[in-house]
Structures are given as C-alpha cells and as structure tokens.
Amino acid sequence: MVPGVEIAPGLFLTEALMDWGRPAPLIDTAFARWDEPVAHHRLLHFDTETTGLAGGTGTRAWMIGAADWLADGRFRLRQLTTTTMGAEAAMLRTFAQWLQPDTVLVSYNGKCYDSPLLKTRYRLARLPDPLSGLGHLDLLHPVRRHWKGVWENCRLATAERELLGVVREDDLPGSEAPAAWLTYLRGGSAVNLRRVLAHNTQDLKSLAGVLLHLAESPR
C-alpha cells in the first residue's frame, strides 16, 4: 500500500507534525548573504523525487516533499506522491496551494535542479508557475563556501553527518528512486516506494537542521 490519503485520483498525501529544531521567530540569513532575516513560518523546505537525475523535459517529479514550521514552532512535513502518470497535474496544483507570495523556498541544489524541473512541468501542464518571484535559499552554496576542500564532498548526506550527526541506516539512495516508482507503476511492490518516502522525509528534516546550523553558527 502507498502511505497517505488519496486526495485526487492517483495522488496521495502524507502529513505529519513533529518537534524538529527550535527556530527563533526570525531566522538569520546572513550566511546566504541576505540582508534581512526571515520569519521561520515563511520558510518552505522542499525536495523532489523524479524519474531521472538528468533533468530536461523528459524528466518528471513523481513526488514533492515540503516541510515548514508553523507559527507555534511545530514542524509540518507533507509529501505528495503520484501513483499514475495522470496525477501529475493534481500534484502540481496542490503544491502551488502551499505557496504564498512571501514564501521563501529552502532547498539543496534546488536552484539548479528541483526548481527548474518543476517550472518545466508547470509549463508543460499549462499551469501558472507558482515558483517565479519567490525567494530561494539554496543551502548547497553556503555549505560549499564553508566546507569545500574540508569535507570529502558537499552532498546533503555529508552535510547532515558532519553538522547534525545523522547517519542513515537502510536508506534507499536517491538514485534508486526512479526504479522504485516505475516498479510500482508496473504492478510491483510498494516496499521501495515507502523507503523513498522515508528517504525524502530525512532529506527535509536535514534541510531544516542544516539551515538552523548555518543560521546559528558564528561567522
């Protein structure tokens, strides 16, 4: 079974609330060379799982994960998973509803990969692009400025291990996510699909953790 509630034909939503991080009301974004702090509830951490890593018009996102802090400080994690090709438009419409004009996106390499891919999918679906004009904190860039040449690489898995002490166990690598989805579409098991959701969940939690580390560390 695919986790979550089917909110449209072939589109499943999972949602969880948790205590994760203790953000101040205003997040110091000087680490990203921004002049002004950002209220924590404006931040939307997002990460996609796709049919391939190359990008381009032939690549589609079959899952969008997003997480934000509510006004009371609780961390809300939501994931949209498509189980049919035809559910993509409903997923894109739903994700657009999660964005406000003052939303600030938080990603890891999302400026180069996730955001352009989603913009392409909105265009091909003939839907308005809700990402244009939004602020975007791509944490890969400040991580590289601080630790390139110090760590073996600056992948998110390395950053979460070095900064947060996170060591993943039984994690399905992101490179195997396309096969997990295609296997399910062809009538196969949902076991690896659920492992992708777990992988995406940790990605979102690590995004928030790395963000807070960068914001709170002396420079």
Residue locations for each model-derived region?
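N-terminal accessory regions of nucleic-acid-interacting proteins
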Residues: 1-40
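Acidic active-site catalytic centers that drive phospho-/nucleotidyl reactions
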Residues: 47-49, 114, 138, 203
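Short beta-strand->loop
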Residues: 52, 64, 106-108, 167
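Short hydrophobic "helix-edge" motifs at membrane interfaces and signal-peptide entry regions
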Residues: 37-38, 128, 192-193
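Conserved DEDDh/DEDDy metal-dependent 3′-5′ exonuclease domain
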Residues: 74-163
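Short, function-defining helix-loop hinge/capping sites that tune catalysis or transport
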Residues: 55-57, 117, 146, 211
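Conserved RNase H-like, two-metal-ion catalytic cores of nucleic-acid enzymes
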Residues: 31-101
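Acidic, Mg2+-coordinating catalytic module of metal-dependent nucleases/exonucleases
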Residues: 156-219
